[in-house]
């Protein structure tokens, strides 16, 4: 059941000879890759397979984690996991600080230029990086644009009401 799980990363390569794999994270919560416990792997078009995470560490200077799973003890076994999605249970939601949001809470929010106006678009995704970027689909022409998710440009997020306010600099939304 797809809605029972959250995709938090992807296995991108085997690491060494002892069965470790590299995971590219799609989550801001490193404990999902370092704390032992149940996780799931899923190859596209297949069902989830439960695995036990034994250990994990972040590669210094990289946005990659190296993890070890129970029963994966050599490079051949590790290579068989490449391209699989790394999942956690959907109810495994870490506590957030004020001003932090889960991607799934932002997706679908209406985007407004002021608190009284009609929406100009909808949030379709959040891209992580040096600064997170909201991907917004504009109502006027269906175009998608990226908006820096920083207080100066997105000063207000109203999850309960289903919208957020943006104050884009001139040209940011232009085609």
UniProtKB/Swiss-Prot annotation:
Gene3D superfamilies: PRC-barrel domain, RimM. Residues 98-172 form the PRC barrel domain. One of its GO terms (molecular function) is ribosome binding. Keywords: Chaperone, Cytoplasm, Ribosome biogenesis, rRNA processing. It is found in: Cytoplasm. GO terms for cellular component: cytoplasm; ribosome. The keyword Chaperone applies. InterPro entries: PRC_barrel-like_sf, PRC_RimM, RimM, RimM_N, RimM_N_sf, Transl_B-barrel_sf. GO terms for biological process: ribosomal small subunit biogenesis; rRNA processing. It comes from the Bacteria. NCBIfam families: 16S_RimM (TIGR02273). An accessory protein needed during the final step in the assembly of 30S ribosomal subunit, possibly for assembly of the head region. Essential for efficient processing of 16S rRNA. May be needed both before and after RbfA during the maturation of 16S rRNA. It has affinity for free ribosomal 30S subunits but not for 70S ribosomes. The PRC barrel domain binds ribosomal protein uS19. Binds ribosomal protein uS19. Belongs to the RimM family. This is Ribosome maturation factor RimM.
